[in-house]
Amino acid sequence: MSKTLRKKRHWLSKVQECVVSWGGPAGPDPELLHGGAERGEFPYLAGRLPTGAEGAPGPALLSGKAPAPGDVLLEVNGTPVSGLTHRDTLAVIRHFREPVRLKTVRPGKVINKDLRHYLSLQFQKGSIDHKLQQVIRDNLYLRTIPCTTRAPRDGEVPGVDYNFIPVEQFKALEESGALLESGTYDGNFYGTPKPPAEPSPFQPDPVDQVLFDNDFDTESQRKRTTSVSKMQRMDSSLPEDEEEEEKEAVNGSGGIENKEKHSDSSDWMKPVPSYNQTSSSMDFRNYMSRDETLEPLPKNWEMAYTDTGMIYFIDHNTKTTTWLDPRLCKKAKAPEDCEDGELPYGWEKIEDPQYGTYYVDHINQKTQFENPVLEAKRKKQLGQTDGGPSKSVPEKSLFTRDPSQLIGALIRTSLKKSTMGFGFTIIGGDRPDEFLQVKNVLKDGPAAQDGRIAPGDVIVDINGNCVLGHTHADVVQMFQLVPVNQYVNMTLCRGYPLPDDNEDPVVDIVTATPIINGPPVTKGDICLTSQELIAGTVVLDQNGKTGPMLVNGRLNGPSMDTNEQRISVASSGGSQPELVTIPLVKGPKGFGFAIADSPTGQKVKMILDSQWCQGLQKGDVIKEICHQNVQSLTHLQVVEVLKQFPIGAEVPLLILRGGPPSPTKTGKMKDKQESSGSLEALSDAIPQPMPFPPTAVRSGSPKLDPSEVYLKSKTMYEDKPPNTRDLDVFLRKQESGFGFRVLGGDGADQPIYIGAIIPLGAAEKDGRLRAADELMCIDGVPVKGKSHKQVLDLMTSAARNGQVLLTVRRKIFFGGEKQAEEDESQAVVTQNSSPRLNRAEFATQQSPEVYDVCLQRKENEGFGFVILTSKNKPPPGVIPHKIGRVIDGSPADQCGKLKVGDRISAVNGQSIVELSHDSIVQLIKDAGHVVTLTVVAEEEHRGPPSGTNSAKQSPAPQHRPLGPAQSSASSTDRGATEGEAGKEVSNSYRLSWPEHKHLAQPDAGSASGVGSRHSQAQNSGCFPVELERGPRGFGFSLRGGKEYNMGLFILRLAEDGPAVKDGRVHVGDQIVEINGEPTQGITHTRAIELIQAGGNKVLLLLRPGTGLIPDHSLAPSSLCPYVKPEQH
């Protein structure tokens, strides 16, 4: 799936290089180059270079793309010239023999001619822009001296280190524009004056310093610029994103361009070289110059840049990203072999003002205070090399994706898949730099009979496809897709030991065949640390709770022999599971049923037309289709299998029926990935959460693109908003279509809504679809973030099939007790072979009074009502728009249905709950002379229910207005009048987030671990906090993350930091969301990235704690020093 979007990229992607000859020893004409630091500008080209041959009179372009007039000159033969005067820039150019290599960039929002603008921008420390700012200052200080209003310190020489001037003189320089940058640090003013156009006779020639001073980048050289670098600038601002032309997005992420476009220019992504970074703490993400000693990146790897210019690497084989250069992995040394000042591969040194100096192991995701090199050498001297924190580094260096670099003997074999599989288990592949190895060879299996495969063999090649670096799930799926009685050709390498037993992450049996009260079912079963799980087999314990069934028949029992293959399922409740073969005939509109993802496989979600699927029941799990095993296939792959059969074909289905029902709807699991057996497959499916902990089982489906998973999880697979319910609506197409219109999708963040319901159309006859419902899925394809045209294309595709399955989200405005949302308990009525919800489904609740009001006005009058809009974003479920005034004698007054205080949820069938006030006013104006308002009566509209009828008895948040909602003519808050000549503006009411905090403790008694509570209770008692970055960050540090098997908690609060000043953040509070992304299951590093990605603001959703921080077993990380206060 691809879509067109406007990309924003770093200016490095616009850098151009060319080779120029000036046509004589005098060098370039001074008029060809303008700008210079004395004018407060970068050097830039004033004219276009003519193309010509070398040796011809005048300047000539010999190779590369000619820079355009106005392009900024960054480098000459690899030497940065930014910050030099015009005279010194020409001197550097003339110093080199012809031809010379120029590096230029087209001016943009971040880097342009204005040197003062670039120096005023804030960049992340360590980024290429931050580095370039330091280079500019170093070049400036060759000709100028920074000034300050503080007194000289011991050892400082006036006129050498700083010019020490009074405050009045400093402000005079600032007002005259003589300072390139200015600001305050530690209560004193600092500034960098413009250098003079002509140097004094006592100043040395800067060319030698710029070109050959190896100590130019040392700490001693920069000591005097520390205050200037860290000062609070007067005109500081964040950089704007550079906009690029429209490009095709890949997998919806828009992140990667087609490399074929750059086949002639392999260096197109390389940054400007020689902004030298010394052998300091940032070795693991060094800015790479044209280092010819480095070989090309491995196959399907790509080097890319963050928005701030940081280099990272994309592995398209595993669809993962890393800071670590894969080419340096082969050159990695053991820690004890590293020299002083050198760090092992994958390590980073952090100098933190609060925690001091510590070291981060990015490979093993650990932190420690001791230098890993000194630690390894110390332990080597003491003879205690075991257990060192970098023990895995030598092992990592053995990994390679190049088969020619493998150590050991290559073994080639061909195995025939039996009903028992291939007869061996595999281990590894949990990380991109980990081999997949044979764990066990099962007795009497094809591998044992072949005799050539042994434990420890590394899987190199499967049917001609190199799998070095592939994930565990990818390789398992490749084996599972081989039909029974077919051969697979394999290449293995013998010579690598198996990892220790305590490091075995996951073992997959590609072969074992469980017996479930019937014939064998071939499936790649999954086990964790020698405990095998039959995917989807769920039993009940004595308390009636669900849990995974181990192959030895015990729940969560001790480990078992991995060679165990045959089991029988013992159930303490529910019907006995059975395998049933059902013959089906494909009708003109498909097989007549819809399927959905479930923990046990693809299950029958809905019977649409029983005449074509007689014998099939809702809840049946599909195991085989026409004798083809489909247990390991994704949702869309099963749909494709069903689609390939022609109309009238007889297709036998092997299904699993009975046994204890697995949870079908929980707080964390929604069967949204639905599709009819004959629907069009349009996007990738997302695996649904399992009813037992996700760490206990690995998915057999290939790993999805992280950006795709993230985008989709932000649409409908995250916790759905409270006070909403999701509905599945199946419609059959009539001659006039499906009978409804679609609104929205005008922008990337604009939701899609159901518009008008066409009278006598399919939607109205069905009765379940309503105007203003938010459209979530079309035939299982999420539509959030899609454009209006893309949604129409999906509907057109559905129309060709004659039917559509819609998933819509509807807001609920409570008037009493909460309505039960379990879809499975709702009655289903079938009319004309179409499922239909019972119209009495709301009979048990006090429904709020929601009605439509149609107003008609004359040419010379308005509608006669005033809409007030909440100034602050209210809590979910609260409509922010209400009637503030009804004008006497107006159409609104004459209709008698509008009252002051009534909430307006839709205009002309379009939901306005999420719209701004100005958008609503414009919507009413565009309606012309007739407008239809969807009204929620004032006395019926209440906040979210508390669970009881008394707010005082409930610990749930209560929303109460903090200020009056009366009108005020003097206010400039949002509000408008419709139907009057003048514009009357009113104070909009405000709703507060609850002041008191309620801690919702997780239910530890449920074996499933997921879905034991209703989705609305997940964030119960949580409160949002928005913090603005201060001079040293957001003022808090974190503890926890997935790698520590714990959630994320507030560890410390910095004194006088933004978090302390806010007053709501306390030590021990749990972080539930960061900038809208749930923190469940994310790593410590990912949490830091989310905080940094927010720029100058961060939005946290916190759950109040007890003041105590949960401990974990990793002592070196107990202080979580990786989280730097200055960064968040």
Swiss-Prot record:
A molecular function (GO) term: ATP binding
Protein's recorded name: Membrane-associated guanylate kinase, WW and PDZ domain-containing protein 3
Residues that, per the record, bind ATP: 123-130
GO BP term, example: signal transduction
Alphabetical keyword list: ATP-binding, Cell junction, Cell membrane, Membrane, Nucleotide-binding, Repeat, Tight junction
Biased composition (Acidic residues): 238-247
Biased composition (Polar residues): 946-956, 965-974
Chief site of localization: membrane
Gene name in the database record: MAGI3
Annotated WW domain residues: 295-328, 341-374
